[in-house]
From Swiss-Prot:
InterPro entries: T6SS_TssF. Core component of the H1 type VI (H1-T6SS) secretion system that plays a role in the release of toxins targeting both eukaryotic and prokaryotic species. The lineage of its organism: Bacteria, Pseudomonadati, Pseudomonadota, Gammaproteobacteria, Pseudomonadales. Pfam families: T6SS_TssF. Interacts with TssA1. It comes from the Bacteria. NCBIfam families: VI_chp_6. It comes from Pseudomonas aeruginosa (strain ATCC 15692 / DSM 22644 / CIP 104116 / JCM 14847 / LMG 12228 / 1C / PRS 101 / PAO1). This is Type VI secretion system component TssF1.
Amino acid sequence: MNPRLLEYYNQELQHIRESAAEFAEEFPKIAGRLSLSGFECADPYVERLLEGFAYLTARVQLKLDAEYPTFTHNLLEIAYPHYLAPTPSMTVVQLRPDPNEGALSSGFSIERGASLRGQLGPDDQTACEYRTAHPVTLWPLEVAQADYFGNPAAVLGRLAASEPRAKAGLRIRLRSGAGIPFDSLSLDALPLYLHGADEQPYRLYEQLLGNACAVFVRAPDNAWVERLPTSSLRARGFDDEDALLPVVPRAFQGYRLLQEYFALPARFLFVEFSGLNRALRRCHGEELELVVLFGKHDQRLEGTVDAEQLVPFCTPAINLFPRRCDRIHLSDRVNEHHVIVDRTRPLDFEVHSLQQVSGHGSGPEQPFQPFYAVRDPARYGREQAYFRVRREPRVLSSKQRRKGPRSTYVGSETFVALVDANQAPYRHDLRQLGIAALCTNRDLPLFMPIGAHKSDFTLEDSAPVMQVRCLAGPSRPRASRAHDASAWRLISQLSLNYLSLAERGQGAAALRELLRLYGDSGDPALQLQIEGLREVSSKPCTRRLPMPGPIVFGRGLEITLDFDENAFRGTGVFLLGAVFERFLARYVSINSFTETVLRTGERGEVMRWQAKPGSRPNL
């Protein structure tokens, strides 16, 4: 039972008793019949009558309050449906290849969406299921050595002299396995995950993507050197095809980037070396080196970088997977139906979103479309059959209230209603309802025995993988915030646009309010980062647009983000700046651009990203 019912009941009863005194004074004759003479009522039957009335009005008040989230949910269902769903647990894993199994010389591809099963805990019955976000190609190679140095001339000699701006460098030695020379590999791109403790991987990420001025591939004995353009070194994880959360076409994808960042910042710590094939054809041995020179030197990285911090064959993964829920038996006496993934283990699964709803009876299958989806009679026919979804925080059982839940994350429950075009109950002769949904394992990722076994996960598909190791996470799942007072704050961002960001004195406040919607309010470190955004300013500018074809100039916005670096101890400010750079580029329309500048009070201008054309359509 909702605990607010008792609160409303006491309020209504107090109001009746207080107003009874005024009523008795104004109308003593009528009040005398009801035995009302003041705050107390002498007649016990009238007292019971007043208490019953207070109970009924309290229930009416609850029903009125229930219409408030219904309105906000309906609005968010149209514009940003991902706000209504919980944020699943996320992780970063390495798929370590088995050199003794399969032919890896031509590469073995593991596509995006591969299923990973976690190990069972001592009291668990259900294994957590994760799905990968990046495609991974396995090769017979390893990172044998890596070192960061601050004097390129002393380490690299003439190679460093070819780049006078170089003040530091990173050397990565790759070694092939099973006696296979590099020129027999068709490898062209090599993604690496930056692994490590505390702030170190974030500092290395800033050096690689913010300060790289030259990239070389060479033989260890310097017998040959191949220079690559700096554009061959790029970030991974920001594109829609690398997304962890579902990509909703009608929603702005910049919000998804923020949601993933605040759930697990390490999911963006990926860099990729591309265009390697030409250099590899020159390497007839089993070792080669990737050398990156930097225009700035970070002294804290010198002597601390090793091969364990540059990990190949990695991918982010999310505890989100498709599953058919148990059939629902329909009844005319019930308007809403509880969606249960598995009745034998109801607490081990949570519905993230519904993908397909269909009714089953004596006749043909009846498909139901989302009520707020685009309606196309030519495609779905003229049968007005829709479903509407409602999500509520899970109510603890009496046993859980006595002994406590198994974790602090309780999760939510999903209810579906069958309606017609007017949201009236759908009249039917169906007997069962079949539902396909995206599901999570609720709070089970919190109990996974990470590091207790040789492999933290098992790859469901057959592949030459001997170990799946968890490198970051699993992160804590988060409940939807559309049920509390932040629902209106979610709706308020509908009015946020690049003009509000450009408004002097208002841009920082608008972005901080936006970040509070995604950051965990119970995490002091994240809240400190949000407050670390001190100022946002913008000015119009004209730049040459970076696009193929003839030279084209365009008008856009130079947006400067000013941060307090002391608020980002442990993670650094560069990664959040990179997320914002992609966010702002997606925010502006085509035929315009943004040029994002990252500044801190401690270091001044940290990074000026290249002008990036907008990707938002005008219509």
